[in-house]
Amino acid sequence: MKKLKIILGLSLIIILIFNLNYKSKYNDSATYIEGIIDKYKFDGSKLSLEVLGKERIVCNYYFDTIEEKESFKKKIKYGQTIYLEGKINIPNENTNFKLFNYRKYLLSKKIYYVFNIEKIEIKNNINLLYKIKNHLVKKLDKFNSPYLYAFILGDTNYIEEDIKESFQNNGISHLLAISGMHITFLFNGLYNLLNKIKKRKTNIIIVTILLFIYLFLVGFSTSSIRAGTMFIILKIKKIKPYKLLLTIFFLFLIYNPYLIFSQSFLLSFVVTFYLIIFKDLIKGNYFKKTLMTSLIAFIAGTPIIIYNYNSINLLSILLNLLFVPLISYIIFPLSFLSLLFNLKKTYTFFINIFEYIFNFIIYSNTAYMAPIKLAKNICKFYILLFDIIPVAYKII
């Protein structure tokens, strides 16, 4: 057993070193890209694509006319095979005043180049999973609700930038993402429902297949993979959740060391770890449990948020206390039910309530942000104190 652990440890170190020294399959002189459209976004006169070719790559195309843009909107779909000619570039480091490092962001997604498209050709040989996703998008289009894309597919491209910025500034941007909480809520409900019909082993197989399909539909985000993997493994085998979480964390970093630059990746794991090790504090009635969950998540995420933005919203605990139940237990389930049944009016009613409360609280409060300007070294100390030490303490 000891030898096996040593062999496993050495193997992981070798894989990590290999990934750190990984060289892109494209080169600086590439003028042709062929692959599958995995993601796309229309942004003004620009079409931004994530294409799965030799490896994942971002490709940008600029429209000459409004008519050309509208034509592409009608014909572009997920899963189409695309043939591109143009020029390849290394992504820029920083692109805005907040010093958002675009290159590191792309590296965290294992993207090494950006391709500027000059000529584009599309073919419609789409596989089954992408056909399902395109069918979902077509149904969502009928609702004309930008939030529905976020709640069902984790796609926030349809939500206006100022609204997304308000969510981020107020510490509730996770409500627009397919978080671990949503995955657990959705598939735990499905698992419990199947338990009344099928045997346990059959249930796990069915849920695993459906979970994989859903993870594909939402783009295999790190938080959804983390939550989905933990959900299935904990159903199959009794294992300490924090050990499983740390194992998944390190496996992610071995697969892609640049994930350490991803704020969403760090927040997902750190907040989940805190909720696990302090689960004994989350007791009592519904209000107390929700309050403690928000407080623990706030304490866990604060060092990372301050390090990235040099500011923190002190009201985010109360905002989460208000909006998490509304989104997670009413609007999120309604989003799925609306696709199956004629519940558009009910869904719209609760979305209107949410928007009214959100706008009233956010825009009537001129001092909702409490900026904390701190040096990077102090932020590192906070991360050490509040995030790293608890992890080390639990392991020891």
Please place each PLM-identified region on the residue numbering.
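Membrane-interface helix/helix-cap signal primarily in integral membrane proteins
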Residues: 9-174
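Juxtamembrane membrane-water interface segments that cap and precede transmembrane helices
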Residues: 130, 160-170, 309-319, 359-376
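Hydrophobic alpha-helical transmembrane segments in multi-pass membrane proteins
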Residues: 4-10, 115, 164-317, 377-396
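C-terminal regulatory/interaction regions
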Residues: 2-7, 14-27, 38-39, 43-45, ...
